[in-house]
UniProtKB/Swiss-Prot annotation:
Its EC number is 3.1.-.-, 5.6.2.4. The gene is addA. Heterodimer of AddA and AddB/RexB. It comes from Staphylococcus aureus (strain USA300 / TCH1516). It catalyses: Couples ATP hydrolysis with the unwinding of duplex DNA by translocating in the 3'-5' direction; ATP + H2O = ADP + phosphate + H(+). InterPro entries: AddA, DNA_helicase_UvrD-like_C, DNA_helicase_UvrD/REP, P-loop_NTPase, PDDEXK-like_dom_sf, PDDEXK_AddAB-type, Restrct_endonuc-II-like, UvrD-like_ATP-bd. This is ATP-dependent helicase/nuclease subunit A.
Length: 1217
């Protein structure tokens, strides 16, 4: 059928119009990010109904998630209703409003489930089956693997013995079990899992396939050998320009001859490469050589660097790809064949037994959905069944969203119910292979790529391909910079798809013409000498500064009104590859009182409230586990003190278990009676809960614990109470879900939790923040897919790719199979095998390709502005990245394949564009003006140097709260209506004062006034402060190992508090004696001296401020104060404030009748390049001006005299206010 002509004035682009109306053959729509694919998909469905008269239930629409399916169905229903209202006499539209409820708009799993429910008789299964929960499936599969391994231990086949010796350790079979599990999940992602498993051994037995693997490695090694040869020639060219380097040139000449032999005829001579030594040592560069080439020092260093690069590339090829002769590699494959075959047999046994167990329990999992559906739709020979033919007749079109994320089982299911071949089929597929980021879920992007390469724009002879490239989301600066990065980063070799004109993004959004460049921020870490913060913590602080800058200076454009509004918290998202940085960000945002939310799938089991409940459950299950028993005793529930625990243990120090020590203490006549009563009550509780757990499900046990000890109420009252409460209810709900499975009991529930923790799975902290809540969000790139935000901060760019799987003894790949290292049982030595080397190389290439696609997803989330945050140890590494090798229009293949992280590539590409110092052969273009507008980058690159003095943390040892202090509220028995009405109508005359805190610290007032100055509601800010309190570390942790930054800050304050002031100044020797005295008096810990910054204190002693204080008439240290805030703020009469201000001033001195206060400060700040001390001083003064003003006003109120003040920063110096 031909595509109708597009009328004038329609909103659709030409490509969108074709996507809506193309028919008569299979259609693949390559929809780039922000190109409106969902709108196109909905419009196509609507036009099928309105224009072609097709009933909505005759269309099968497959989405990736249930949420997408619901949204799609809602949109279609809405459009049908609108059309029906416009044409009320249309009977066809009226029918669609009824049929929409039966429409097949769902995930493929939902479609499969419906298929099974309708045709369960074909499968010979009980129709009353249910879907297994995650908990049940995990436990059942683990149980099955354990049982199957035990069965094979009974058989003790020689191949099995060799497998266990290779893949198990002396202590456990954990690695062996993990490999079996991975193989199971890989296999069931194929239409015929057992056939896939049977084929794993083929490369180990057939020489033809082994030859293919050697060729694969040869082709890959050619990339690195060619790059090595280029580096060697560059070294030669550079040395040729110099004097007195004949010996160096002679070595390089020999290497060039060897390399010429390896590359002779354009082929790689692998036997010659492995049979000869390469990379001879280069003679030292002597002082005489440097003197002779004093004008070419940089070139000399570059020549050495190029030769070093040559050696490393050759070493990589020889060690990673051809560490052994080809014949030896083939021989190893023969030795491994029986082991691989036996491993496949074990996995098939697991598969069969796992299926048997599921059938006996009458449960199905998601894998069963797909394979049972396939069983219904195919005959034994693989051809479509009669049922499949009926579905082919029924569905007039099949529409698949997110096609790039399908696997081969799902592809087979779709092929069974579609009609025709590609040239005359009815399959409509939408997706973007550049956003295929779910390989860990067995998604297979090659399915999309194969069709993309096979289909044509005009659709002649095969399927039709349509490229949706116009982006309606982002500003042109975001798009052009993204295009430029990927034009030089992604191709078929690395990235699996060519980023050409068809793939790139074209501007289509109606923004104004103002300039909003992409910002690439490079943070140069401060070393340990200049900062107590780790590199990750420094980056977190830096990100907060970017957020503050956005809130203060940036606006958001409204496309509908054509006007700007101020940026708010919810306009900003921080994207990271994983949640590894979440804790640092939470703390950094908390320090600045910026509302911040992480919807993490990690960290749930680390939450204090969850750990408490799990300790309780473990102690009830087995009180002989000391960690959990003592943890429960020390918790807020039972509140045993350290001294009490010590008393118990001292009485019987040789007991194996602490529980025994408790029993022995209770029975000891000399024991403390009060402690004995407390212990008896505790043990009574334990025994009572144990008895309760025998007769009740886990969720009821948890509920009883919550109610008995007011657990929900207690944690709800802490900072972050909403989230803590949600976490507690989340654990309760998980217990309910667990009890609904076929497993029962406390032991099984704990085992399930342990399995999740051990394998790194997590429930994630419960989400208590809605999509419209005004908070800064952090999310992973995966969870951001499909979303958009005005401001995107893409951070963590310098975090290395996770290549842990590449180091495993077994490498799995859907296309190639299984690569197992060779293990010599007699010598107990492991070697890379031909298969493991080849598949490891393939896996690394696929991993880097997927990481590139993740970068693409991250960059294309930004609507208005994009911030890229990288971090380096020193700025010298940036020069190396600028000089990264290129090949044609791309960063060289070897550089991309070995790239450690995204920053490595992004900075190299963008810095080359801006650099004026690198030679032309390292640039992509000689003239920037030659770049087309659509891919001309608009980016600001800034390098920021982090300088820091430890942030100050005030710890309160006196605050202690207990659930036992909660009082039970008593209901009154008053029933006189008049009295009730009088009480309900009563209005408290001082209601405004109730909204004011009775006591505030100066720091709290500082935060309040800062947020008021910025136009932010302070109460709103406080409401969203992250729920992580700062508690002092236990003494035994503080006394051992490295102190944290806040502990060092407290230590420095303690030293300054007692520091003597002498007119002649104290010497360094006297300072050491003074600190030894503090240790002797137990004012500071014995091991504290190593953490005291002596040089900084000596700097203070030698300062002018020290001299002024030493000559003062009076000196007061650590002076506490409490004063009425109304007096300090000088409020008018009638506006008195009931609040009081409480604080502590580090030091006050009196000189010449004038009172001065001194506040010692520790702080973190960014010293940007070129920043003067005066500018930093102004910055720090502004930061503390509110706090210092309160100190000044407070002292003037108390003393009724003029007061002046100083700030002293340990690493910066004195600032007078």
């Amino acid at each position: 059928m031909t595509i109708p002509e597009k009328p004038q004035g329609v909103i659709w682009t030409d490509a969108q119009w074709q996507s809506i109306y193309a028919t008569g053959q299979d259609v693949l729509v390559a929809a780039a990010a922000g190109s409106g694919k969902t709108a196109v998909l909905v419009e196509r469905i609507i036009q099928k109904i309105l224009r072609d008269g097709i009933d909505v239930d005759r269309l099968l629409v497959v989405t990736f998630t249930n949420l997408s399916a619901r949204e799609m169905k809602h949109r279609v229903d809405q459009r049908i209703q609108e059309a029906s209202i416009a044409d009320p006499a249309n009977a066809h539209l009226k029918n669609q409003r009824i049929k929409i409820h039966q429409a097949q708009i769902s995930t493929l799993h939902s479609f499969c489930l419906k298929l099974i429910q309708q045709h369960y008789d074909v499968l010979n299964i009980d129709p009353n089956f249910r879907t297994s929960s995650e908990a049940e499936n995990i436990l059942l599969l683990e149980q099955t693997i354990d049982e199957v391994i035990e069965q094979h231990y009974d058989i003790l086949d020689p191949a099995f013995i060799e497998l266990t010796e290779q893949l198990s350790s002396d202590r456990s079979d954990d690695q062996f079990r993990m490999i079996i599990k991975q193989l199971y999940f890989f296999s069931v992602a194929n239409p015929n899992p057992k056939n896939w498993l049977d084929q794993l051994v083929t490369p180990y037995e057939e020489e033809a396939q082994q030859a293919q693997l050697i060729q694969l490695l040869t082709d890959l090694s050619k990339v690195f050998i060619t790059a090595a040869y280029d580096a060697l020639n560059k070294a030669y060219d550079l040395f040729s320009m110099m004097d007195s380097v004949d010996k160096h040139l002679a070595v390089i000449e020999d290497e060039r001859r060897l390399m010429g032999r390896v590359l002779e005829g354009g082929f790689i001579d692998i036997p010659y490469l492995t049979g000869h030594e390469f990379g001879a040592r280069l003679p030292n560069v002597t002082a005489k050589i440097k003197e002779a080439n004093e004008m070419m020092v940089d070139a000399l260093e570059d020549a050495k660097l190029q030769y070093k690069k040559y050696k490393s590339l050759i070493d990589k090829v020889k060690s990673d790809y051809f560490s052994r002769e080809a014949d030896d590699l083939k021989a190893d494959m023969q030795q491994l064949a029986p082991r691989v075959k036996y491993l496949a047999r074990i996995v098939k046994d697991v598969m069969s037994e796992f299926n048997r167990k599921k059938r006996s329990k009458n449960i199905l999992d998601f894998s069963d959905y797909e394979h049972f559906a396939l069983q219904i739709l195919t005959n034994e020979d693989g051809s479509p069944s009669e049922i499949a033919e009926s579905y082919r007749q029924h569905f007039q079109e099949i529409l698949v969203d997110e096609y790039q994320d399908t696997n081969r089982v799902q592809e087979k299911i779709l092929s069974c119910i579609k009609t025709g071949d590609e040239h005359n089929g009815n399959l409509f597929m939408v997706g973007d292979v550049k956003q295929s980021i779910y390989k860990f879920r067995q998604a297979d992007p090659s399915l999309f790529i194969e069709k993309y390469q096979r289909f044509t724009i005009d659709g002649d002879g095969t399927g039709r391909r349509i490229d949706l490239s116009q982006n309606f989301r982002s500003r042109k600066e975001v798009l052009s910079t993204t295009n430029y990065i990927f034009k030089h980063m992604m191709d078929e070799q690395v990235g699996e798809v060519k980023y050409d004109e068809a793939a790139q993004l074209y501007y289509g959004a109606p923004y104004d013409e103002s300039d909003h460049p992409v910002n690439l921020k490079v943070l140069v870490e401060a070393d340990q000498e200049h900062s107590d913060l780790t590199g990750s913590e420094q980056e977190a602080h830096f990100i907060v500064e970017q957020v503050k800058d956005i809130l203060e200076h940036q606006k958001v454009y409204d496309m509908k009104t054509g006007s700007y509004r101020s940026a708010t918290y919810k306009d900003i998202v921080i994207l990271e590859r994983s949640f590894g940085q979440a804790r640092n960000l939470q703390q950094a945002f908390k320090n600045e009182d910026i509302p911040f939310h992480v919807n993490s799938r990690e960290g749930y089991f680390e939450q204090t409230e969850v750990r408490l409940v799990l300790s309780f459950l473990r102690a009830i299950d087995n009180p002989l586990q000391d960690i959990y028993l003592v943890g429960l005793m020390r918790s807020v529930i039972y509140q045993f003190k350290e001294d009490e625990l010590a008393q118990i243990r001292i009485l019987s120090p040789n007991d194996d278990y602490f529980y025994q020590s408790i029993v022995n203490y209770i029975n000891d006549e000399a024991a403390d009676a009060i402690l004995v009563d407390k212990l008896k009550m505790f043990l009574s509780d334990i025994q009572s809960y144990q008895q309760y757990s025998k007769d009740h499900p886990v969720y009821q046990l948890i509920d009883k614990f919550y109610n008995d000890h007011y657990v929900i109420q207690y944690f709800s009252g802490l900072i972050g109470g909403r989230g803590r409460r949600a976490n507690l209810y989340g654990l309760f709900n998980k217990a309910i879900e667990f009890e609904n499975s076929s497993f029962r009991g406390l032991y099984q529930f704990i085992r399930f939790i342990d399995e999740l923790i051990e394998r790194g799975k997590d429930f994630g902290e419960e989400n208590v923040v809605g999509p419209n809540d005004n908070v800064v969000r952090m999310m992973t790139i995966h969870s951001s897919k499909g979303l958009e935000f005005p401001f995107v901060i893409y951070s963590g760019l310098s975090k290395d790719f996770n290549k842990r799987d590449l180091k495993q003894p077994v490498i799995l790949n859907q296309q190639f199979g299984l690569g197992m290292d060779y293990f010599d049982v007699d010598k107990e030595m492991a070697f890379p095998s031909l298969a493991s080397v080849a598949y490891r190389a393939v896996a690394e290439k696929e991993l880097v390709s997927e990481e590139m696609r993740l970068v693409y997803v991250a960059l294309t989330r930004a609507k208005e502005q994009l911030y890229l945050i990288g971090r380096v140890k020193n700025d010298k590494s940036l020069l190396e990245l600028e000089q990264l090798s290129i090949s044609g229009e791309h960063i060289a293949v070897n550089e991309r394949l070995t790239s450690p992280n995204p920053f490595h590539l992004i900075y190299s590409i963008l810095s080359k564009h801006q650099s004026a110092s690198i030679p032309d052969d390292l640039k992509f273009e000689k003239d920037i003006a030659q770049i087309e507008d659509s891919s001309r980058p608009n980016v600001n690159i800034s390098i920021v140097y982090f300088e820091d003095v430890s942030t100050e943390t005030i710890l309160d040892n006196d605050e202690y709260r207990s659930v036992n202090q909660l009082e039970t509220m008593q209901n009154g028995n008053e029933d006189v209506k008049a009295q009730i009405k009088h009480q309900l109508d009563y209005r408290y005359p001082y209601v405004n004062d109730t909204k004011k805190p009775s006591k505030q610290s100066v720091s709290e007032l500082k935060r309040q006034y800062e947020t008021e100055e910025s136009g932010t509601s302070y109460e709103r800010v406080r409401q969203y402060r992250i729920g992580f309190s700062t508690y002092e570390r236990p003494k035994f942790l503080s006394e051992q190992g490295k102190r944290k930054a806040n502990e060092i800050g407290t230590l420095m304050h303690t030293v300054m508090q007692h520091l003597p002031f002498k007119k002649e100044r104290i010497s360094e020797v006297e300072l050491h004696q003074y600190i030894d005295g503090l240790i002797d008096k137990h004012i500071i810990e014995a091991d504290a001296k190593k953490d005291i910054r002596m040089d900084e204190i000596m700097t203070f002693i030698n300062s002018e401020l020290y001299s002024i204080i030493a000559e003062a008439e009076q000196v007061y240290r650590e002076l506490p104060f409490v004063v009425n805030q109304a007096l300090v703020d000088q409020l008018p009469q009638g506006d008195e404030d009931v609040s009081i201000i409480q604080g502590m001033i580090d030091l006050i001195f009196v000189k010449d009748g004038v009172h001065y206060f001194v506040d010692y400060k520790t702080d973190a700040f960014n010293r940007r390049r070129g920043m003067t001390d005066e500018e930093i001083g102004t910055q720090l003064k502004n930061k503390y001006k509110i706090q210092m003003k309160y100190y000044q006003n407070t002292l003037q109120t108390i003393l009724n005299k003029e007061v002046k003040g100083y700030l002293y920063f340990f690493k910066f110096g004195t600032l007078q206010l």
